[in-house]
């Protein structure tokens, strides 16, 4: 009797990707974040779809439509907060996923790594545009401040900003186009995720040792299916606890005030997951320099595979690199804290030191440490 799972053209693809996929036998819980990101994307698309059914992308009614969703729509409040906090969970998983890739040397899968960076940029763009939609104070001023950064581009900057705004300020045209892009981007992200997985399955997964695991593989199902299921339950429990007990913990109180172009909030700041990049942007007094530093802080990830001079792939057996890695994590936490502080001393100085440290660790200390470790191991 033929097995449909292995014969049917569609079932065969699913079978090779999630059931009979040969996976390394020693991958840890750090490898769970890929499937958790898939779950987050699914939650965001489903909740977003239901929100879009009731939301209006007009400056006069956008804020009221969000209030209407929370007050009048059946379980509207839970859908809204699942979507808002789902974005936070998405970024927590994203940062953990990228961190694992850095630690265990997964960036040597160049195609997978590069499409991953493209995915990160797409998710960041989607989250930024989504934050503008409720049309609160922080939505409006965040949109104004961040889109205004493009005016730093020489010659064509100011024209480009007005083109994005669809006028001479952030207004109805801006809100409408942001809603359109925010709606379509998750589907583009889904397509990119499929390409990401396609490239990953060309090489197979990495593992904590960084060594080839062809001699010791196990089927994805049932072993990693059950393992992913545990991660999934933990993530959903965390998300629902956040939504039920403190839904506004990660939000900004200013966004409960309708957008007012005549009144600037005392501190314009983005959501917590952008604060590290925002701190790097603010730490440079020059506008164009700040924009370049902001872009570099993300795009520097693309350089990492080319700066990897170590003979060992993973950091598992490289204590000096491990110390640097955790210094980088601490530095990013400091930058996140600084991004949420007002622009005054000592925060300005701390932000500048942390920004320099960030680039110094990645561009100089890490390659040097890799070479030193090779020497110590007489390689």
Curated annotation (Swiss-Prot):
A ubiquinone binds at residue 201. CDD domains: cytochrome_b_C, Cytochrome_b_N. It is found in: Mitochondrion inner membrane. Pfam families: Cytochrom_B_C, Cytochrome_B. Heme b b566 binds at residues 97, 196. Its main location: mitochondrion. The chain crosses the membrane at residues 33-53, 77-98, 113-133, 178-198, 226-246, 288-308, 320-340, 347-367. The keyword Aminoacyl-tRNA synthetase does not apply. GO terms for cellular component: mitochondrial inner membrane; respiratory chain complex III. Binds 2 heme b groups non-covalently. Component of the ubiquinol-cytochrome c reductase complex (complex III or cytochrome b-c1 complex) that is part of the mitochondrial respiratory chain. The b-c1 complex mediates electron transfer from ubiquinol to cytochrome c. Contributes to the generation of a proton gradient across the mitochondrial membrane that is then used for ATP synthesis. PANTHER family: CYTOCHROME B (PTHR19271:SF16). The cytochrome bc1 complex contains 11 subunits: 3 respiratory subunits (MT-CYB, CYC1 and UQCRFS1), 2 core proteins (UQCRC1 and UQCRC2) and 6 low-molecular weight proteins (UQCRH/QCR6, UQCRB/QCR7, UQCRQ/QCR8, UQCR10/QCR9, UQCR11/QCR10 and a cleavage product of UQCRFS1). This cytochrome bc1 complex then forms a dimer. This is Cytochrome b. The lineage of its organism: Eukaryota, Metazoa, Chordata, Craniata, Vertebrata.
């Amino acid at each position: 009797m033929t097995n449909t799972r292995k014969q049917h053209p569609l079932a065969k693809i699913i079978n090779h990707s999630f059931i009979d996929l040969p996976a390394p036998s020693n991958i840890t819980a750090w490898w769970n974040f890929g499937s958790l990101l898939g779950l987050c994307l699914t939650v965001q698309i489903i909740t977003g779809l239901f929100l879009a059914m009731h939301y209006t992308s007009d400056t006069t009614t956008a804020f009221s439509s969000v209030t209407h969703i929370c007050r009048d729509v059946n379980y509207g409040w839970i859908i809204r907060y699942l979507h808002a906090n789902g974005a936070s969970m998405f970024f927590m998983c994203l940062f953990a996923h990228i961190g694992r890739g850095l630690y265990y040397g997964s960036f040597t899968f160049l195609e997978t790594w590069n499409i991953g960076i493209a995915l990160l940029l797409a998710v960041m763009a989607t989250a930024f545009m989504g934050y503008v939609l409720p049309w609160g104070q922080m939505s409006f001023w965040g949109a104004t401040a961040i889109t205004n950064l493009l005016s730093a581009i020489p010659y064509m900057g100011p024209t480009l900003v007005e083109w994005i705004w669809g006028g001479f300020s952030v207004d109805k045209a801006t809100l409408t186009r942001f809603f359109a892009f925010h709606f379509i981007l998750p589907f583009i992200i889904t397509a990119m995720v499929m390409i990401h997985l396609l490239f990953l399955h060309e090489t197979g997964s990495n593992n904590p040792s960084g060594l080839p695991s062809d001699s010791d593989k196990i089927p994805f199902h049932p072993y990693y299916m059950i393992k992913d299921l545990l991660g999934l339950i933990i993530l959903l429990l965390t998300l629902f606890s956040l939504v039920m007990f403190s839904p506004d913990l990660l939000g900004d109180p200013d966004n409960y005030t309708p957008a007012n172009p005549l009144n600037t909030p005392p501190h314009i700041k983005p959501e917590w997951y952008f604060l590290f990049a925002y701190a790097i942007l603010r730490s440079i007094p020059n506008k164009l320099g700040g924009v370049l530093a902001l872009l570099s802080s993300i795009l520097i990830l693309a350089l990492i595979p080319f700066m990897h001079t170590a003979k060992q792939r993973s950091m598992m057996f490289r204590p000096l690199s491990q110390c640097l890695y955790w210094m980088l994590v601490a530095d990013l936490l400091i930058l996140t804290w600084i991004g949420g502080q007002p622009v005054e001393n000592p925060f300005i100085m701390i932000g500048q030191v942390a920004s320099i440290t960030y680039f110094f660790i990645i561009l100089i200390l890490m390659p040097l440490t890799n070479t030193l470790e090779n020497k110590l191991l007489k390689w």
